[in-house]
């Protein structure tokens, strides 16, 4: 199962809410929206390359909602420090996310919830976010609302 549109929207909204002061200063909101779209698009391309054969593989959790939500949070953290220039971004980010290929075993579907214990999905997404960011050397921006 891939992520539901509402789940994806909630993660993007969380990012926008966290960066709102910067976003509202943009004079061309359409261009700003295109910029964020490009960031997410390029991040997902880089993530696909970094995950390799685990991407869209039913035997792994790399493209399940819990991990995709965590990856969008990593995307927001990475974009804060390395969104520009857009040229070469996929290659830069693929290199940055390449340690994720070493995480493939942890993201096998079998035993996944035991390897990432949590009280619920909100806590599990936060944990996976921290683990993926740490593996890629990306600083996690803490937010007041952690959900």
Predicted regions and their residues:
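Accessory terminal alpha-helical modules
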Residues: 1-147
